[in-house]
Design a protein with these regions (language model features):
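Basic, Lys/Arg-enriched alpha-helical interface segments
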Residues: 1-57, 65-70, 76, 81-84
Length: 84
């Protein structure tokens, strides 16, 4: 059962600001979430219910919507700024 991947508009804007080589790595990792959406760690606190995957110094915060078989990338950013 393969999931589809969606990227929130604000996350896409943040991705556009990242260096091209890092963009490609981030896109590859997001693509891999189609096959294994629970690959990332579970977040707590303010980000409860969301998951996180690390890509070098960047983080992708995403939500798995099991009913719709969708992985939604909510935030993409540098590790120092993604949680702000």
């Amino acid at each position: 059962m393969a999931y589809s991947v969606s990227i929130k508009q604000s996350a896409a804007k943040a991705l556009a600001k990242v260096a091209h080589e890092d963009q490609l790595r981030i896109i590859d990792v997001i693509d891999e979430l189609k096959a294994n959406p629970t690959a990332g760690g579970v977040l707590k606190g303010e980000f409860s219910g969301l998951r996180l995957i690390r890509v070098g110094n960047y983080r992708v915060v995403y939500e798995v919507q099991d009913q719709k078989l969708v992985v939604l990338a909510v935030r993409i950013g540098h590790r120092r700024e993604v949680y702000r």
